[in-house]
């Protein structure tokens, strides 16, 4: 007799980290991952403000189109998630409004 209630191994979850260098290549990777329900961490620490603005604008549009979300982790790191993934913030800190003002500073 087969036990249908036996624990089954879960598929491994994936998450991708992008440190943008080339808009065309990196934007495609971000979109492809999100379309495949893979969350993306975008690290803009070493990205020019102009390039960072384009990447974040693209990521915001992509996540909106798939009913996903973008959360800012710190000044230069963002987490983009498909609708199948929920980011739970530290309950001790109130949820902050999105502040992308650093993207608009002049070079």
Could you say what each language-model-derived stretch is?
Residues 1-40, 45, 60, 64, ...:
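Positively charged, small/polar-rich N-terminal and surface patches that mediate targeting and assembly
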Residues 55:
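Acidic, glycine/polar-enriched metal-coordinating patches/loops
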């Amino acid at each position: 007799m087969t036990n249908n209630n036996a624990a089954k191994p879960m598929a491994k979850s994936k998450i991708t980290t992008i440190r943008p260098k080339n808009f065309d290549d990196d934007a495609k990777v971000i979109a492809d991952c999100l379309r495949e329900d893979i969350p993306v961490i975008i690290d803009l620490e070493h990205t020019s403000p102009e390039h960072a603005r384009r990447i974040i604008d693209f990521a915001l549009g992509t996540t909106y189109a798939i009913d996903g979300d973008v959360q800012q982790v710190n000044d230069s790191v963002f987490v983009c998630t498909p609708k199948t993934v929920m980011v739970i913030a530290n309950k001790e800190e109130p949820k902050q409004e999105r502040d992308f003002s650093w993207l608009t500073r002049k070079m």
